[in-house]
Swiss-Prot record:
Lineage: Bacteria, Pseudomonadati, Pseudomonadota, Gammaproteobacteria, Enterobacterales
The protein's name in its UniProt record: Rhamnulokinase
InterPro entries per record: ATPase_NBD, FGGY_C, FGGY_N, Rhamnulokinase
Cofactor dependence: Mg(2+)
Gene3D superfamilies per UniProt: 3.30.420.40
Family: Belongs to the rhamnulokinase family.
Signal peptide, first to last residue: none
Chain sites annotated for binding ATP: A13, S14, S15, G16, R17, T259, Q304, G402
Keywords, in A-Z order: ATP-binding, Disulfide bond, Kinase, Magnesium, Nucleotide-binding, Rhamnose metabolism, Transferase
Species this chain originates from: Escherichia coli (strain SE11)
Length: 489
């Protein structure tokens, strides 16, 4: 038997994990084992909302060392994280300034300024990326305007996964799928757009040319002295999650469900027409030259904040209580930018209901019901938008990531969208990370080959739409006429 041992470092906005994958070549089986899981979150530092990258690096190294201590020979390592955020380095590789998080308010007003000065359509034609106020384009402008004293010291700007790869290997890389989330990569050249970079105030010398997934960045030397390849995987966590989505045919859509919900489809060509611009559709880079045509939805961030504020620890009990409540009594638009990072999420949700003359969700279960129903309805809106954009309906929706464990939300999604939902795999970002490593090690041919492995080894659950459900009736009778506000457009 031939085995490969690959390690995936998967960092999300609320948690991180170091996972060991064991691939058996002869039977094409893949098993995952969690080695180390740790918390991640936002911090306040010198007036900014930041990430504790030192703590994250320590947790990554701890997880890697645990694998080595077990005597396991690691064949490769890959790192994926969230998008848009970056770390600045000087000529000696030391950090400059703070690793500011995308939920910081420093970019307020800059997206509108860019649209006024450069033209909204021109920015979109160049980048193909949706307008979000925290895109790297606006973060860099905020940096150069508000902290000009840092500029002379900056030699390099590394996106989060590239920074952690650099810390392990000493080698710098700018991975393509994550680079596209910045709104700074030209969609035609796959290189940094000079006009957009110039507006941001950043120096092009801070960046190297983006590289597509599948190359070896460098090597991490483990405590035992072995040199282990660190692979540039599809380092944007959604790009990795899509790789592990067992999409079957052109009529399959995906929903990567976590802190954010990313709903979309794969395409060989981008969509940058006026319809796509009006819908704020993004064309993020994927593996093998594919595009992830998708839309950002605020996702389970709202629930995470409610759980935190109400100090709720038993999520299954909350979901059970939520399921017993009637549907669609409290409806908000999760994509309203008032929910990006409010001081108190519960109060913000209640205020949104009050302002629209609805009942006010008071209990924990009512707040959760409001979030789940509102998300499912927004999923239906976005799926319809995506189908109209490409001129063809979808036959199934694959929900992947941690959020796919929420069976109530899965069923609500199936009912609201009127589509068959296949939930799983849960650890989609980790699996997609592993998939690129296995391709780099010449164990698998391509993404479609890897998806066959996922289909046969992952635990998948199907949810059939119920046209007689409360939310299905709501969609048919009321929801189809409502107007929704674009997220940050």
């Amino acid at each position: 038997m031939t085995f490969r041992n690959c390690v995936a470092v998967d960092l999300g906005a609320s948690s991180g994990r170091v996972m060991l994958a064991r691939y058996e070549r002869e039977c094409r089986s893949l098993t995952l084992r969690e080695i180390h899981r740790f918390k991640n979150g936002l911090h306040s530092q010198n007036g900014y909302v930041t990430w504790n990258v030192d703590s994250l690096e320590s947790a990554i190294r701890l997880g890697l060392n645990k694998v080595c201590e077990e005597g396991i020979r690691i064949d490769s390592i890959g790192i994926d994280t969230w998008g848009v955020d970056f770390v600045l380095l000087d000529q000696q590789g030391q950090r400059v300034g703070l690793p500011v998080a995308y939920r910081d308010s420093r970019t307020n007003g800059l997206m509108a300024q860019a649209q006024q000065q450069l033209g909204k359509r021109d920015i979109y034609q160049r980048s193909g990326i949706q307008f979000l106020p925290f895109n790297t384009l606006y973060q860099l402008r905020a940096l150069t305007e508000q902290q000009p004293e840092l500029i002379p010291h900056i030699a390099h700007a590394l996106l989060m996964p590239d920074y952690f790869s650099y810390r392990l290997t000493g080698k710098m890389n700018w991975e393509y799928t994550n680079a596209t989330t910045t709104q700074l990569v030209n969609i035609n050249s796959d290189d940094w757009d000079e006009s957009l970079l110039a507006w941001s105030g950043a120096n092009k010398a801070w960046f190297g040319r983006p590289t597509h997934p599948g190359n070896v960045i460098g090597h991490w030397i483990c405590p035992q002295g072995n040199e282990i390849p660190v692979v540039a995987v599809a380092s944007h966590d959604t790009a990795s999650a899509v790789i592990a989505s067992p999409l079957n045919g052109s009529r399959a859509a995906y929903l990567s469900s976590g802190t954010w919900s990313l709903m979309g489809f794969e395409s060989q060509t981008p969509f940058t027409n006026d319809t796509a611009l009006a819908a704020n559709i993004t064309n993020e880079g994927g593996a093998e030259g594919r595009y992830r045509v998708l839309k950002n939805i605020m996702g389970l961030w709202l629930l995470q904040r409610v759980l935190q504020e109400r100090q709720i620890n038993d999520l299954p009990a909350l979901i059970a209580a939520t399921q017993a409540l009637p549907a669609c009594r409290f409806i908000i638009n999760p994509n309203d930018d008032r929910f990006i990072n409010p001081e108190a999420m519960c109060s913000e949700i209640q205020a949104a209901c009050r302002e629209t003359a609805q009942p006010i969700p008071e209990s924990d279960a009512e707040l959760a019901r409001c979030i789940f129903d509102s998300l499912a309805l927004l999923y239906a809106d976005v799926l319809h938008e995506l189908a109209q954009l490409r001129g063809e309906d979808f036959s199934q929706l694959h929900i992947v990531g941690g959020g796919c464990q929420n069976t109530l939300l899965n069923q609500l999604c199936a009912d609201a969208c009127g589509i068959r939902v296949i939930a799983g795999p849960v650890e989609a970002s980790t699996l997609g990370n592993i998939g690129i490593q296995l391709m780099t090690l010449d164990e698998l041919n391509n993404v479609d080959d890897f998806r066959q492995v996922v289909s046969t080894t992952a635990n998948l659950t199907t949810f059939t739409p119920n046209p007689d459900s409360e939310i299905a009736h709501y969609v048919a009778q009321i929801h189809s006429t409502r107007q929704t506000k674009e997220l940050c457009a």
